[in-house]
């Protein structure tokens, strides 16, 4: 499976068009599962036939002939022009975004859905794509119902006029649904033949429509004033007046005068009228939806869409102005088909109405089917859209056409054009906002590969397009707008939880990178302050199979800080054909996902583990985010447990996060080597291990040694566990007289324990601090203990650390202490095993079985490397059998008592 790291394009080194220079088994180039080969192409449409013609016809639709009077009659010329301007500003802003995205790479079938999904990712793309598809479905229903309305307006039976033989078609809800179904069936038949026959039919209709528009303009100038009889059924009759070019008529038509819509009986307002008018501008995606049939979609979509928008804007503008100059309010508001009554030859307008409505219906039906087919191919909705994958031998997605036809049939049940116009407008607006959002995201991400050839846009136009679309959604119909957003969120969640990772690229990653880089540059290490210190941890991992418990525990220890998993592969790059580390990253990242830890991964290749650790200590991190604390597993002879065999997360088929970016549980099991056999020679010697501790201290890193963590019972899985304490021993148990309770290392120890106690899963545990006090045989032994406890309690209060204080009598242990000389401990002298065992017994006895994890003071390793093994043996004796234990040595001040 491809992943996000896959290249965007796969280049072939051989030509496939030069007559045989390529290899005989040349296969088509594959990009995002779309084949771009040398066989016969299905891309046949040019800019004019594939974009300009369908876009113009879709934007005109029924509105240009049947709703001009509706808009001007209710809103007046001034508000009509305002509506036109607002609508085209929104349209134009979206067109700029469409042009930018479509000229930034090859556009495949699916149009707007393809552009959104390949920019914003599958969740957002699939959600908006489905809603844009539904918008086209509803729009198709609007256009078909508009055509039925126009037919019945002329040929519908009128009981009050039995002498008119033309008006013979029965009227009523059932008959309207029947007529609409017949028209829709005709549209489906044309779309089933294919895009080629559709483009030919559209061009013929295009010519026809412009001839009709020309006759309308001529009629405005040539027809003399007349009175028009208006009938709404029954015996209701009224008259409207066509005055010709008249300034008084213009004056009367300037202001708005909203009244009842005679088709629905609802009172009109600015929002409802704008919804109907805007529906006549929403066809800008008609050419984009046919991107799979265009010869050069990246060139045709921007050029053709811009030309179509300019043409329709001026046609609407001219019609609004001439209508306001020539027709009175009654004619405009009571007869939406008044163009026919004032035309030099009335049948011309009928032809135009029927042609545009039929063309818009076909355009939205075929466009919706292409969107649905693209959605089905991407398999975002599973078996629900499986029938839409069916295609003919010629590549026509007939399954998607039939599927869409069935949904439009359901829309036709609404019965009235204006009833569903608001739904169409809201769905189109949310799709336009998504297009603008996609372009805005690309612009803000500043990705080097976003360099569209169309440059007449900016983030300002994208943002303005988003805001204007969202505002108009709620102005048109708050209920529909709210419902559409709820639907969008539901679809987002559905696709997110059921879809697997895609190879389309994630714009979120580009945006995150852009923001992280910006803030990393602002993160200045020179401004660090102890008040805002946080752990930035590098955990060195030999094999995740044996370290998973520790990886999870350190995740609780980071407290919002940096957490990096470091690993050293031993080897010499000079002897290898390629760097093996590069292929390992995906497995380590999947491990991080499986364990649900917030960690980065850093791998390196070195001849030795010690050298690799030095490299990671130096170069891991970036800017102000570099590790200040190193965690190492303890070096002992214990037989490591294979955690992968115990946790269901790593059992194939049982993990809820299986198959993340192509790495499933089986792959993880196979990638990481088995747990080390006790008889197998180790890659790291005891001497090198202690030297790594020295290296970390020399680099001014705090050091933590973790032992016995396979025995750790995690808090969330142990509600009934008796372990309820986090124990802290802030004194160097190996050399008590060489340290103090308030030195930097002791305070660091307290800070780390406090951080663990602040983690959500560890809050129910009680922090417990042990003070080792000797009576020294004096008479004031008890008072000395009390004074030591009071002094330490005051320190904890200043540090705002809540903890129990336990005073431990250290006299018995001190009796086994190594030789003292003048109060100085002789580091070269070995510490007796009796003392170490006595100290361990004291730690065990005082803590009991209720201790979950212990924090102990880690003394510095001896400077003499010959003593390193003895140093490790002392630590081994002290901590053997203690349970989960952290040995910590801190170098940096991390506590503050002031505000």
UniProtKB/Swiss-Prot annotation:
Source organism of this protein record: Xenopus laevis
Localisation: Cell membrane; Lysosome membrane
Gene of this entry: slc12a9
Lineage: Eukaryota, Metazoa, Chordata, Craniata, Vertebrata
An example Gene Ontology molecular-function term: potassium:chloride symporter activity
Cytoplasmic-facing ranges: 1-44, 102-127, 198-202, 288-304, 369-393, 441-469, 761-899
Glycosylated sites: 235, 246
GO BP term (any one): chloride transmembrane transport
Function: Seems to correspond to a subunit of a multimeric transport system and thus, additional subunits may be required for its function. May play a role in lysosomal ion flux and osmoregulation.
Homology family: Belongs to the SLC12A transporter family.
Extracellular side: 66-80, 149-176, 224-266, 326-347, 415-419, 491-739
Protein name: Solute carrier family 12 member 9
Main location: membrane
Annotated InterPro entries: AA-permease/SLC12A_dom (IPR004841), SLC12_C (IPR018491), SLC12A_fam (IPR004842)
Keywords: Cell membrane, Glycoprotein, Lysosome, Membrane, Transmembrane, Transmembrane helix, Transport
Membrane topology recorded in Swiss-Prot or TrEMBL: Multi-pass membrane protein
Spans traversing the lipid bilayer: 45-65, 81-101, 128-148, 177-197, 203-223, 267-287, 305-325, 348-368, 394-414, 420-440, 470-490, 740-760
